[in-house]
Amino acid sequence: GELPLLERPFVLGHFDCWGLVLSYFRQTHGIELHDYRVDYPWWEDQYPDNFYQECWFECGFREFTGPPQPGDMVIMQVQANKWNHAGILLEGNMLLHHLYGHLSQRVPYGGYWQERTMKVLRYKSLC
């Protein structure tokens, strides 16, 4: 079976931020998203990949009007020149995410994370 969404160990290309988004949509909505995970630091400048910026639309996410709601995906840019991190908004303005080198966790969505947000998106069948 799958690991729980909280307190997963971080393993790049396996248990990482996109892996958590994949699991959230599979467990919560029965939606299978495309698996873009790779086991190298693709967000570093020497790599051409830019998965979040280039793939969100083809993966089924859409921009929306109105306020964000639980289940929306947040794409962030954290200590990189590319959009390199994602999480899921939860009830109570919480963010479910899995940061490099940390256990997956829920944190308040504001301040640091909100300032680094590039897009908030909703899966097309949930719009």
Write out the residue ranges for each language-model feature.
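Active-site-adjacent structural segments surrounding the nucleophilic cysteine of cysteine proteases
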Residues: 1-8
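Secondary-structure boundary/capping signal
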Residues: 29-33, 103
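...with weaker cross-activation on analogous glycine-rich loops/strands in unrelated enzymes
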Residues: 38-103, 126
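Surface-exposed patches in mature extracellular/periplasmic domains of secreted proteins
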Residues: 14, 32-37
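Active-site nucleophilic cysteine motif
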Residues: 9-29
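Glycine- and charge-enriched low-complexity intrinsically disordered segments
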Residues: 107-127
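Residue-level signal for pocket-adjacent positions within structured domains
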Residues: 5, 102-104, 115
